[in-house]
Amino acid sequence: MELHNDEKRLLKAFQESNEKTMNLEELSKYIEKEKVMRAAFWLSGRDFLEIIENKTKLCELNELGNKSLDFGIPERKVANYIKENNLESIPIKELSKILEKDETGAALGNLKKKGLVEIDKGNIVFKNLNYEDIEEEILKKVSINPDLSTYSKDEVKIVENLKKRGFLNLKEVVDRSFEIKDAGTEFIKNPIEIKEEITQLTREMIVSGKWKDYFIRPYDAKIPTEDIYPAKAHPMSKIIQEVNEVLISMGFKEVKSQIVQTEFWNFDTLFEPQDHPARDMQDTFFVKYPNTGKVPKELLEKVKGIHECGTIDGEKISKGWCYKFDENVSKRTVLRTHTTVSSIKYLASLSESERENPHKVFCIDRVFRNETIDYKHLPEFYQCEGIVMAEDVNFDNLVGILKEFLRKLGFEKVRIRPAYFPFTEPSLEAEVYMEGKGWLELLGAGVFRPEVLEPFGIKKPVLAWGIGLSRLAMLRFGLTDIRELHKNDMEWLKKTAVNE
């Protein structure tokens, strides 16, 4: 094992001093102070050395604290003013003559809190002008002894309060010592030779042959290095990008739709009855302006017939929902509650000839639900939804597509179980297996019902599925609270790998 010269110098310090533990000042006699930490870090990675950190909390007076130490804290200034002028009380409004503007409110509050005054008809009446103030005593102590570890618990509380009042600052000082370990002790039993070394060759060295006089230090790729956190995309953005790339690689085309939709497109076309709980204000954001939108009349009539009695163009295809369909409800505007509306609008836009061709489309975008914010719900989140339309696709194809999609996202174990959704039949939920967590639900899917497709003149089967990307991100990054994705916790953002 070949060590860097700085590592050798540091070990030589232990060898010559015959000490087991040394501090920074002691080591700096053998090696430049700025090189000690780097060499110690390398040696700790080799298990030659242990870096011991002792953290000490210090408190120090700031400008206001020093000023208060000389002239008294605001409460004392008021007491001294009354005492020096032989007054029994002063009007509250006169505090501005004694104190700085930003001291007035705090002084009165602290005088009352400490039980030193009474307020009588707008006047401040002192009970005791010769009181002893523990805060003043602590200010004096801080000026002499900044080491917070020597203070009692009660004194620490007073220090923290003085910090809140702006009299002092707290800081943490790290004192490092270095202890040689068994591997290092074995190494220094032998003489340590320090040769002049170089890390790169120049043309002059090669031509002159001087390179022979130097030791060329080899590179060790296994040496631990300091963590570097370069700029990178937000983890949620990477999830969206990854899902997008996976679907495009599977032959899907991306489609988009507007955030504001009519209830017709968001609910009615999906065969969701107008009295369904999901359409209540408790679950949906209704738009105030514009509060209504345009709905294609011909399609509206077809969807209305499907809802009321299951008929379209006089042909009965189901029982429908057997209720009175309200066209005004269909025209109300909402923030879309799912991205399925993008697929529905895509299907509605297909011409008669285009319906003969197979189609694979998906949408990744924001959706909105009137949810109470908690560890697993947000009112705004990203959803991914896709459809496959072709002559010969069936439920087995849907399962195969989903398993391949999830496999490409890194989930090798997938299981399917039955589910219910108003607009698909049959329907399923896909669960993935994660070590240490077991089986976890991830997405819902199914085959669009005829009541959804018939109004658009589509006779071919359409497979559909949807997945909440926030849920996927939580599983990927090991989060238990969905809010952590959006807290802008810089420490978490720096350390979260986005390429796993």
From Swiss-Prot:
Keywords (A to Z) from UniProt: Aminoacyl-tRNA synthetase, ATP-binding, Cytoplasm, Ligase, Magnesium, Metal-binding, Nucleotide-binding, Protein biosynthesis
Q: Does the keyword Ion transport apply?
A: no
Q: Which Gene3D superfamilies match?
A: 1.10.10.2320, 1.10.10.2330, 3.30.1370.240, Bira Bifunctional Protein, Domain 2 (3.30.930.10)
- Identify the Pfam families for this entry: tRNA-synt_2d
The record's EC number reads: 6.1.1.20
The record's listing under SUPFAM superfamilies reads: Class II aaRS and biotin synthetases
Q: Name one GO cellular component term.
A: cytoplasm
| Top-rank lineage group of the source organism | Archaea
Q: Which cofactor does it need?
A: Mg(2+)
Q: Name one GO molecular function term.
A: tRNA binding
> GO biological process annotations for this chain's record?
phenylalanyl-tRNA aminoacylation
**Residues binding Mg(2+):** E425
**Residues noted as binding L-phenylalanine in the record, renumbered to the chain:** T340, F423, F448
CDD domains in the record: PheRS_alpha_core
Protein location: Cytoplasm
Q: What is its main location?
A: cytoplasm
Q: How is the cofactor bound?
A: Binds 2 magnesium ions per tetramer.
Q: Which reaction does it catalyse?
A: tRNA(Phe) + L-phenylalanine + ATP = L-phenylalanyl-tRNA(Phe) + AMP + diphosphate + H(+)
Subunit structure comment from the entry: Tetramer of two alpha and two beta subunits.
Q: HAMAP family, alphabetically?
A: Phe_tRNA_synth_alpha2 (MF_00282)
What is stated as this protein's family in its record? Belongs to the class-II aminoacyl-tRNA synthetase family. Phe-tRNA synthetase alpha subunit type 2 subfamily.
Q: What is this protein's name?
A: Phenylalanine--tRNA ligase alpha subunit
Taxonomic lineage of the native organism: Archaea, Methanobacteriati, Methanobacteriota, Methanomada group, Methanococci
What gene name is given for the protein in this entry?
pheS
